[in-house]
Each structure stands twice: as C-alpha cells, then as structure tokens.
C-alpha cells in the first residue's frame, strides 16, 4: 500500500475510533479535552534526581499556550533549489564526536551538493542522502546544534524502533517544526514502515523531530517528519536512520537516559559536552 493510501487509512481508523467512542471533540463550539492528551503543564528544564533511572511510560502533551510561546525550530534552506525544511535532531558523527550537525528528511536534498543555510548561517551541504518514504540526509558544521527541542525540552535519548511500534493508539506525540512550531497530536498507527500521527503540519516542517514528553520535562526522540496528508503526518523511525548515516543523537547530560539501564533506549546517542 502506498504511503498516501496508508495516511488515508490512518484517517479512516481515527474517524472510526471517534464514532465508536460516541464522543465529540467539541461541545457548543468549544473544544473538549481529549483524555489521551490531557493538557498537563510540563516544566521545561526539570531534571530527575537520577538521570540514568528508567523513564516513565506515561507520556504527556504540551499545553497549547506553552507550545505557542516556544520559539520555532531552525529552518534549513538549500539555497540553489529554495527547498525549505526543518532542522531535525541534533547529532554528532559516530566516528568524530566533535563534528556536529542535524539529521533531516532525504527529500530536502533537491540539488545534491548545493549550499545549505541554518537559520541564515551557512553550513555544509547535505550528504549521505538516501531517498524514499523513509529518506534521510545529514548536514554538518552546525555550531547551533543543541540537545533540546521545543524551546528547552532537554533530549533524554532515542527509543528503539520496536519500542516505538508498541506505543498505544492515542499516545501523545509532539513535533518541533520551523513552520508550524511546536504541535502535539496522537498516534493512530505504528507498523514496520513508520509512525502515523494525527497531527497537521505545513510545507517546510519536513525533517522536524517527533518526540515524547515525560513528566520530568524531558524529550525522548522517536522519529522525523517525512510526509503529510490532510491532518495526518507520517514519520520515519529515528533509530535506524542514525545507523544509516553514521550519526548519534546529542543528549543533555542532566537528562540523558543510560541505555544500559533502560533497554528501551538506543545506544546511538552521545552526551553533549
């Protein structure tokens, strides 16, 4: 089944779920809170007493007021093609940890070898580009690559693909886009091809980090934005993409989860110094 058809199928599944629950998302024109995405305030910058402890399995959403106040993520522009995308998770080269950059959706590299700017500052052209539904590319030389998302949520780690595939229907997932800003939605389907989220995005959000929020105020990365269809978004799993491009995600030293103590987490990470 094609990716667009799968996104359409995800929309149908979501619609059926709403019908079966006999619930409405609005009453008298006013929005009603979805129990699966209750607006629990998350304190940005909070840290656990023991950063290596296993994180919670209950994930939260980011309240709209807090999301709206967050600065938009860095925009990447390929100058020759004009292609605009979002800087994905901050990474370090597996072979050279001091080399920093961003992982991005593969289709952002429209003219290979062309110059790329990050927030107006020129960095290296995209490299190691792989195309397709789960395409990926990287750009290096980004001095502003930091282990945070959504304006200050510290990155704790990356969930393995099989763990993300077991996330339940309705699990809150958030995105940090250069165009749409910080948005949160819910899981509609997970399979071997990727993660489907009820989350409207805009052109230019491709590559944006998809992440889960813990009540410690930290972010756990699960994927990057690849495609959209209506109010639904398809994301590629982050962990296997990192292996394909020889990169590791930067984590914050005060928030990092040790994959040796929590096997749900990938070891494709490095603590930012």
Model-predicted segments: where are they?
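Catalytic histidine site
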Residues: 30-34, 39-144, 189-206, 213-273
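N-terminal export and membrane-targeting signals
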Residues: 1-15
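Bacterial signal peptide processing site
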Residues: 24-27
């Amino acid at each position: 089944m094609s990716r667009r058809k799968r996104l359409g199928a995800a929309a149908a599944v979501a619609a059926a779920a709403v019908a079966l629950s006999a619930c409405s998302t609005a009453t008298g024109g006013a929005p009603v809170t979805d129990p699966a995405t209750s607006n629990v305030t998350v304190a940005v910058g909070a840290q656990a007493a023991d950063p290596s402890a296993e994180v919670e399995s209950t994930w939260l959403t980011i309240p709209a007021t807090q999301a709206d106040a967050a600065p938009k993520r860095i925009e990447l522009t390929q100058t020759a093609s004009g292609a605009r995308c979002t800087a994905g998770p901050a990474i370090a080269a597996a072979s050279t940890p001091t080399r920093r950059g961003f992982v991005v959706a593969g289709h952002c590299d429209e003219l290979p070898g062309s110059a790329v700017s990050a927030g107006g500052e020129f960095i290296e052209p995209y490299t190691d580009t792989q195309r397709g539904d789960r395409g990926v590319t990287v750009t290096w030389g980004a001095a502003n690559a930091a282990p945070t998302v959504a304006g200050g949520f510290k990155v704790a780690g990356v969930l393995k693909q099989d763990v993300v595939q077991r996330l339940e229907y309705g699990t809150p997932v958030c995105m940090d886009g250069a165009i749409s800003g910080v948005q949160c939605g819910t899981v509609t389907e997970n399979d071997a091809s990727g993660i489907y989220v009820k989350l409207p995005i805009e052109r230019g959000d491709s590559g944006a980090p998809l992440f889960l929020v813990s009540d410690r105020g930290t972010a756990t990365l699960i994927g990057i934005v690849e495609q959209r269809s209506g109010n639904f978004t398809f994301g590629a799993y982050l962990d296997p993409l990192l292996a394909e491009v020889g990169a590791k995600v930067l984590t914050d030293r005060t928030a990092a989860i040790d994959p040796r103590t929590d096997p749900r987490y990938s070891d494709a990470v490095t603590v930012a110094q």
